[in-house]
Regions:
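Conserved donor-binding/catalytic core segment of Leloir-type glycosyltransferases
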Residues: 4, 193-220, 228-230
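Short His-centered aromatic/hydrophobic patch
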Residues: 86-91, 110
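Carbohydrate-associated surface elements
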Residues: 151, 174
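Nucleotide-activated donor-binding/catalytic signature segment of Leloir-type glycosyltransferases, i.e.
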Residues: 196, 240-263, 267
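Short alpha-helical donor nucleotide-sugar binding micro-motif in glycosyltransferases
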Residues: 271-276
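Short hydrophobic beta-strand element within catalytic cores of glycosyltransferases
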Residues: 278, 301-304, 314
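Aromatic "clamp/platform" in nucleotide-sugar-dependent glycosyltransferases that forms part
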Residues: 284
Length: 384
C-alpha cells in the first residue's frame, strides 16, 4: 500500500505541531508492515522528500495563492499512489485536486480549522478567504477526515455541516517519550543565563497561542518566579510588536524573564523543559496541543487553558491544571491564570507529583505506534 503524505512543513522547516505530527507519523508509518510512504512538501528539494518550490510567477503573490499554486504542482505528481493524506489547509488542496484528477482516495488530517481562526486574516489578508475556501472544498470532498481530538471532531462537524459525520474519526496526536524525556543538562540553562525557579512557554507568536494573555497575567505573578519564553516566528507584525512590547515591559523590572527567539535545538529544548517547574499553555484555540505532551514527556506539570482538545491531554488535578477561557472576558482569564500560576508555583512537591504523572500518561496513552496503526486501518478502509 503506497501512501503519499502532503504537507507544508518538513525538516528543516518545521515550526508547529502539525509539522511535528507529520514527521513522527511518517516515521511510525514506515515501521508498519506493508506500508510504503513518500512525502510531498513545500519549500524546495529535500533528500528524504519530494520538495516543491513556489511555481514561477507566484513568488511575490499572496501566501494563499502561493500555497494553491504549489498544491497544483504537487497534485500533478500524485497519479501513482494508493492513498493521499494531506495536512493543514496549505496542503489540502493538493489532495483535493488529485482526487478529482485521478480518483485517488484523499484523507485530510484536521489540525486546525480556518473558520475558527479569524485572526489569520491579519496574516493572509484577502488570502484568508482563499484558505477558507480551499479547506472547505477539501473537507467536504474527502473520503475521510482525521480529527486530532474529540473536540476537533465536534468542531469539524459544526464548521462544515455538509460533512458526513461517519467520515470523521478521532485519532489523537502522539509523542515520542524517548525523544521527550527528562534532560538535566544544566549547561543549557547556563548558556541562556537561566537560574532559579521558573515556568516556561514554548510556541509560535500568534494570537492562537495566547502569549499576550500570559504576559499580561505574569505582571501580577511574584517576581520570585522566573519566566522562560521560547517564542519566535510571529505570524504578522502586529502580534509580534504587541508581544515584544509586553516582554520588554516585564524585563524592565525583572531580571528573571528570558526570551529565546530562535528555535532551540532539540537537546536544548528538552533541557529547558526539564528545568522548568511548570509548563504554560494559554492557548485560546488548540485542537490538541502536542506541545503539552512534549512537556509531559519531560515530567513537567502543565497549566493550560481548557479549550479544544487540551482537556483530553492534560488531566486536571492529575497532570496539571486547566483554566477556563471565555473570549468575551479576557481579563478574567488572565486573572485566573495569574492565580493558578501563583498557587501551583507555591507547591513544588505537588508540581513534581503532577510532572511524574504527566510522563506516565503520555507514555501510556499517546504513543506514535498506536497512532500509526489506527491510521493504517483508516487507509485500508477507504481503499475497500
Amino acid at each position: 500500500m503506497k501512501i503519499s503524505l502532503v504537507t507544508k512543513e518538513w525538516p528543516p522547516q518545521v515550526y508547529g505541531g502539525a509539522g511535528v505530527h507529520v514527521v513522527q507519523l511518517t516515521e511510525s508509518l514506515r515501521n508498519q508492515p506493508g506500508v510504503n510512504v513518500d512525502v510531498h512538501c513545500f519549500g524546495g528539494p529535500r533528500e528524504d522528500a519530494f520538495g516543491y518550490i513556489t511555481p514561477v510567477g507566484f513568488e511575490n503573490s499572496n501566501a494563499a495563492l502561493q500555497a494553491i499554486a504549489t498544491d497544483l504542482a504537487i497534485a500533478d505528481k500524485l497519479s501513482a499512489t494508493d492513498v493521499i493524506h494531506s495536512h493543514t489547509w496549505y496542503a489540502n488542496y493538493a489532495g483535493f485536486a488529485a482526487n478529482l484528477l485521478y480518483g485517488t482516495p484523499h484523507i485530510v488530517s484536521a489540525h486546525s480549522l480556518e473558520p475558527l481562526r479569524p485572526w489569520k486574516a491579519e496574516q493572509l489578508g484577502g488570502g484568508y478567504r482563499i484558505s477558507s475556501w480551499a479547506e472547505k472544498s477539501a473537507y467536504e470532498a474527502a473520503d475521510a477526515i482525521i480529527a486530532v481530538s474529540d473536540g476537533m471532531r465536534a468542531d469539524v462537524l459544526s464548521a462544515y455541516p455538509n460533512v458526513d459525520p461517519a467520515k470523521v474519526v478521532t485519532i489523537r496526536n502522539g509523542v515520542d517519550v524517548n525523544k521527550f524525556a527528562p534532560n538535566k543538562d544544566e549547561k543549557v540553562l547556563e548558556k541562556y543565563g537561566i537560574e532559579g525557579r521558573y515556568a516556561i512557554f514554548v510556541g509560535r507568536i500568534t494570537r492562537q497561542k495566547g502569549l499576550a494573555h500570559l504576559l499580561r497575567a505574569w505582571k501580577k505573578v511574584s517576581p520570585d518566579y522566573g519566566l522562560v519564553l521560547a517564542a519566535g516566528s510571529p505570524d504578522e507584525p502586529g502580534i509580534g510588536k504587541e508581544v515584544a512590547d509586553l516582554i520588554f515591559e516585564l524585563q524592565a523590572t525583572r531580571k528573571n524573564v528570558w526570551w529565546i527567539k530562535e528555535m532551540a535545538p532539540h537537546h536544548e529544548l528538552t533541557a529547558l523543559l526539564t528545568g522548568a517547574e511548570l509548563f504554560l499553555c494559554p492557548s485560546i484555540y488548540e485542537p490538541l496541543g502536542i506541545v503539552n505532551l512534549e512537556a509531559m514527556g519531560c515530567e513537567v506539570a502543565v497549566l493550560a487553558s481548557a479549550v479544544g482538545g487540551i482537556p483530553e491531554v492534560v488531566a486536571d488535578g492529575e497532570t496539571g491544571k486547566l483554566v477556563s477561557y471565555d473570549a468575551t472576558n479576557s481579563e478574567k482569564f488572565e486573572s485566573d491564570f495569574t492565580n493558578a500560576i501563583e498557587d501551583l508555583m507555591s507547591k513544588p512537591d505537588l508540581l513534581e507529583k503532577l510532572g511524574k504523572a504527566g510522563r506516565i500518561r503520555a507514555k501510556e496513552h499517546f504513543g506514535w505506534d498506536a497512532v500509526a496503526a489506527q491510521t493504517v486501518q483508516l487507509y485500508t478502509k477507504v481503499l475497500k
